[in-house]
């Protein structure tokens, strides 16, 4: 069994080949580096392989020279629960377009098999792709539309399920686990990694943003429908197809009260940047159970570089403090980008952050970009 870590590439026909004699590399920040065995895990069965147009694969030759390979770089797109350690090593053509927002992960040949530069960080089988996109999904969407006629949220998440294959959306129709209730067409940040809205000159977004404002009654109808029967039921505001949910605080708060007037089952969650503290307070006071906060840095400079928001990191901290003080379970969705979060100044800032705000959980999430997209230095 070979101990060599070998680079791979894709030829002009899309065939994936190993680059004999070229050591496999990964990318952190804007630097290509050699991969080590401890960086690698076997490629998960449910992972996908994706070519990077106009990005040449890069490896290290036997004489130690880092050089491009005459073929396209290949990336692994990992299922939920995995966190990439390195991006694919590549050389970008000057005329290359920005790539769509996916968690591009280095993949190589090791022990005569495909391995990727990642770690398994979230042991939750519920997000395994095997549970989604089943042959009966289309009929389940039709059933729910008949049971909740005229509800625009159902129409929205039905499209998200069938067109964009969103797992959280699909759970509404499977009547289980966590389902999303999108509510806000607007946002108070301009994230580099926004998956629902990007400027025309940027990379294409992998989802379409909601174009309407659901009423409290529409919100409650979906919430009650789901929580009454779903095992481990959760309804979540703040989905990939919307902006910032706290900006819809009036309708969300009213919807939560209507839900809780009918059932105390399940959990009500919000995924949020929590930058608008007044909106967060209204939703917390209405009966929010849990709050997942999207965040990339505990330093103002690092935070602003990504979110480009109309609020400040201190507003985020104030919202988290209010939620913790009012018994809400708070977790962080920590956006991880190789070469950024692992810098010394970032780690030091997180130590201070957690001393001040002892949240209950940290979940690492991949930031969907390649290195040239985020300007942080």
Where are these regions (language model features)?
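Short cysteine clusters
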Residues: 187, 191-194, 237
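Conserved C-terminal portion of the radical SAM core fold
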Residues: 314-373
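C-terminal helical cap(s) of enzyme catalytic domains, especially alpha/beta-barrels
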Residues: 375-377
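Core AdoMet radical
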Residues: 178, 182, 198-279, 286-316, ...
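Short, well-ordered strand-loop elements centered on a beta-strand within folded domains, enriched
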Residues: 3-6, 16-19, 112-122, 273-275
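Short Lys/Arg-enriched alpha/beta "domain-start" segment
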Residues: 1-94, 100
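N-terminal [4Fe-4S]-dependent radical SAM core
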Residues: 97, 102-181, 198-206, 218, ...
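N-terminal cationic-hydrophobic initiation segments that often serve targeting/anchoring roles
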Residues: 114, 227, 260, 284, ...
